[in-house]
Regions:
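A post-motif C-terminal structural segment
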Residues: 1-163
Length: 163
């Protein structure tokens, strides 16, 4: 069973309207998908979750939006890690297909004796060739060590699912 949840519009057209209150859309979507798949796929399942909203913020060079989206992602990731901890035959893989915006971190001020804050800088409104990390947790995570092309991910995952 494969359930793909795309939670935003297509690339470059993502709705980057800020919510007035914190949302848990990604967390809620993942929780619901897991409950449906657990019930309907007793032999196991593959769940791909994408939140393209951060990509839209990157294209817009919107650092505040990116930070808020990362907070939502962090909450979702905590829930997914807890799920893996309760289901030892589960693998969680986190990656990206590209970086957007050429995001860099810099100090807000270079003045001596001033409180320092961080500021995100951007080098483009497009995608970059920056290497994106792959994080894996759970059963089979050791297969994701080292450097490899992202096009190799499906084969690694498929091999693990066949075991």
């Amino acid at each position: 069973v494969c359930l793909a949840a795309q939670l935003a519009a297509s690339e470059g057209n993502a709705d980057t309207t800020r919510f007035s209150e914190p949302t848990e859309y990604l967390h809620k979507a993942c929780t619901k998908a897991l409950s449906v798949l657990e019930k309907d796929a007793p032999k196991g399942f593959f769940l791909m979750v994408e939140s393209a909203i951060i990509d839209g913020y990157g294209h817009n060079n919107d650092s505040e939006g990116m930070i808020e989206e990362m907070k939502e992602f962090d909450q979702t990731l905590k829930a997914l890690i807890a799920y893996v901890d309760k289901h030892p035959n589960t693998l969680l893989v986190v990656t990206a297909d590209h970086e957007t915006g050429g995001t860099g971190v810099a100090y807000k001020s270079h003045e001596v004796n001033q409180p320092e804050g961080l500021h995100l800088n951007f080098s483009t409104k497009g995608h970059t060739g920056t290497v994106v990390p792959v994080f894996a947790y759970g059963a089979g995570a050791e297969k994701f060590r080292g450097i490899f092309q992202n096009r190799e991910l499906p084969g690694i995952i498929e091999g693990l699912m066949r075991q």
